[in-house]
Curated annotation (Swiss-Prot):
Keyword Isomerase: no
UniProt GO molecular function: hormone activity
InterPro entries: Insulin-like, Insulin-like_sf, Insulin_CS, Relaxin, Repro_Hormone_Insulin-like
Transmembrane segments: none
GO cellular component: extracellular region
Function: Relaxin is an ovarian hormone that acts with estrogen to produce dilatation of the birth canal in many mammals.
Organism field: Canis lupus familiaris
PANTHER family recorded: PRORELAXIN H2, RELAXIN
Signal peptide limits: 1-25
Quaternary structure annotation from Swiss-Prot or TrEMBL: Heterodimer of a B chain and an A chain linked by two disulfide bonds.
Lineage of producing organism: Eukaryota, Metazoa, Chordata, Craniata, Vertebrata
Taxonomy, superkingdom: Eukaryota
Assigned protein family: Belongs to the insulin family.
CDD domains: IlGF_like, IlGF_relaxin_like
Protein's UniProt name: Prorelaxin
Length: 177
């Protein structure tokens, strides 16, 4: 029994001694990078090997699984407000069907239901269309860049200048991710 225990203990010790050692960190090494090289270095640091591995796994899953059919929930089709918004967003929809939703004609609404089932509309496209029409008034404001804090943009520019002129470490670049 003791011999069996010692042989297993020796086996575990040998396995643990073969684990890869920690590679010395290169985070403190100064790197000089300007322009495209700086952008590539920033992408390399922020999108490390872990991200690449995750993206590869997602690609494999997409290739294996078949595309799922999207179904419009019946609660959307039964709601007259949403239905009228859907009709406005569908190009080439007959005017009769648009009027039918407003007047409440059941026969034409049933036809509409079949048209919507047969159409190649994607639920995500319909959601985007609704969100675009819903927030159309809000989008007429100034560009999105003006809303982005200027201080953060200035820090990014200062960091690129520092990496170009003086040099920066991977740790400093990682803090900007």
């Amino acid at each position: 029994m003791l011999r069996w225990f010692l042989s297993h203990l020796l086996g575990v010790w040998l396995l643990l001694s073969q684990l890869p050692r920690e590679i010395p960190a290169t985070d403190d090494k100064k790197l000089k990078a300007c322009g495209r090289d700086y952008v590539r270095l920033q992408i390399e640091v922020c999108g490390s090997i872990w991200w690449g591995r995750k993206a590869g796994q997602l690609r494999e899953r997409r290739q294996i699984s078949e595309p799922l059919a999207e179904v419009v929930p019946s609660s959307i089709i039964n709601d007259p407000e949403i239905l009228s918004l859907m009709l406005q967003s569908i190009p080439g929809m007959p005017q009769e069907l648009r009027i039918a939703t407003r007047s409440g004609k059941e026969k034409l609404l049933r036809e509409l239901h079949f048209v919507l089932e047969d159409s190649n509309l994607n639920l995500e496209e319909m959601k985007k269309t609704f969100l675009n029409t819903q927030f159309e008034a809000e989008d007429k404001s100034l560009s999105k860049l003006d809303k982005h804090p200027r201080k953060k943009r200035d820090n990014y520019i200062k960091m690129s200048d520092k990496c170009c002129n003086v040099g920066c470490t991977r740790r400093e670049l990682a803090s900007r991710c």
